[in-house]
């Protein structure tokens, strides 16, 4: 970024705001969110299948957070689905027009874990670049569940693996569901060590790689959080367990 190699330590943001049920609409609230994130070393937010309100970008400009927005899709892209395609393209161009001047708005993806017509995805990204070439564009986050590897036409690759390969040689995160990788991946099937890294996997991509949803593993709940649920979301699951 601006000539400097930049390491992203990211936050998966799925628009989860338990007290209100919607994202904050003011800069002050978002600054507090980002300041908390920064205290954990986070400098990048990936918005899962949504674009946050303008206040979020304004706050990110101040706090130095890089934003990846996404179109609201978790599914498949097909040239035959005209209504969906028209909706998504309208959303994309409005996002670029209304949010594009914010320096924190660095990346835009087509959605989450998409499948479908890559040529159509590539055509859309070409249109976005022609409309506004200030941003980086991707086909989506973890498209084809990583099995497709690096595909020409996108500026960066967000994925859990860089294509298929023997063992865990293409993995760029440690934890997998047992249906997605042998015995649940590196975290679940190897001994703790300080020698494993993702150098070989990253080398298989000709463009920058962002590891997709790295924190997918079980944790024991903190029952002290029960008292914090004073808004629209009720923690029935925590009460049961």
Describe these PLM feature segments.
Residues 44-241:
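Substrate-binding/catalytic cleft of secreted carbohydrate-active enzymes
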